[in-house]
């Protein structure tokens, strides 16, 4: 019975980190768009990126994996992947074609969820290409924002930041192609659930392409 209790826990270190990251999203919007305090924006992005990497490690190390965490962590990740590009677009830091490319990819990905749910799945396994894309964005976005703060190093920071962002974008799109191939195999090989389709258990929600 002990693993069940662990799965149902709410007050865990990883969950608290996810809640903090969630609370920092409106703070990030404010400091960049209203306060024009890009330094604080960089700090929020760095903290969010490091804590996102750390919460999974902590969950395994302290045996604090939970159903809430499996839902909350990827949900917060998606909110960041929507919010940050839009904020950068509104600030004129990145062009809108870049923002729309990322948002269109995520919208297409979200459109496949009903197909997964109808077959008892919540998501497909994350790929190394997807992880590489996430790393590129985690480094690229704060580096470009930091380039807005320091005129002395702006050329170097912007060049490095854009290198990571372009790399991340291509990896992000390639991960979607791999996801589409996986989705095609799932649709062809797995029959729909009989009776009323339902969302699967939350423990698989952390797996995303």
UniProtKB/Swiss-Prot annotation:
Its EC number is 2.7.8.41. Keywords: Cell membrane, Lipid biosynthesis, Lipid metabolism, Membrane, Phospholipid biosynthesis, Phospholipid metabolism, Transferase, Transmembrane, Transmembrane helix. It comes from the Bacteria. It is a multi-pass membrane protein. GO terms for molecular function: cardiolipin synthase (CMP-forming); CDP-diacylglycerol-glycerol-3-phosphate 3-phosphatidyltransferase activity. One of its GO terms (biological process) is glycerophospholipid biosynthetic process. Pathway: Lipid metabolism; phospholipid metabolism. It holds the Pfam family CDP-OH_P_transf. The keyword Membrane applies. The chain crosses the membrane at residues 27-47, 82-102, 126-146, 157-177. PROSITE patterns: CDP_ALCOHOL_P_TRANSF (PS00379). It catalyses: a CDP-1,2-diacyl-sn-glycerol + a 1,2-diacyl-sn-glycero-3-phospho-(1'-sn-glycerol) = a cardiolipin + CMP + H(+); 1,2-dihexadecanoyl-sn-glycero-3-CDP + myo-inositol = 1,2-dihexadecanoyl-sn-glycero-3-phospho-(1D-myo-inositol) + CMP + H(+). It is found in: Cell membrane. GO terms for cellular component: plasma membrane. Gene3D superfamilies: 1.20.120.1760. May catalyze the biosynthesis of cardiolipin from phosphatidylglycerol (PG) and CDP-diacylglycerol. May also catalyze the synthesis of phosphatidylinositol. Belongs to the CDP-alcohol phosphatidyltransferase class-I family. This is Putative cardiolipin synthase. It comes from Mycobacterium tuberculosis (strain ATCC 25618 / H37Rv).
């Amino acid at each position: 019975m002990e693993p069940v209790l662990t799965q149902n826990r709410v007050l865990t270190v990883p969950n608290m980190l996810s809640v903090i990251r969630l609370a920092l999203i409106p703070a990030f919007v404010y400091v960049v768009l209203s306060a024009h305090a890009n330094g604080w924006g960089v700090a929020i992005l760095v903290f969010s990126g490091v804590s996102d990497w750390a919460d999974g490690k902590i969950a395994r190390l302290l045996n604090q994996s939970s159903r809430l965490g499996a839902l909350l962590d990827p949900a917060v990740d998606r909110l960041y992947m929507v919010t940050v590009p839009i904020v950068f677009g509104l600030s004129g830091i990145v062009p809108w074609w870049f923002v729309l490319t990322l948002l269109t990819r995520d919208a297409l990905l979200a459109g496949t969820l009903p197909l997964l749910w109808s077959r008892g799945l919540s998501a497909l396994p994350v790929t190394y290409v997807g992880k590489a894309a996430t790393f590129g964005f985690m480094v690229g976005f704060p580096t470009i924002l930091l380039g807005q703060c320091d005129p002395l190093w702006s050329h170097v920071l912007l060049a490095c930041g854009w290198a990571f962002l372009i790399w991340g974008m291509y990896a992000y799109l390639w991960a979607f192609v791999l996801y589409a191939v996986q989705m095609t195999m799932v649709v062809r090989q797995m029959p729909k659930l009989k009776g009323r389709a339902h969302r699967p258990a939350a423990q698989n929600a952390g797996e995303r392409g």
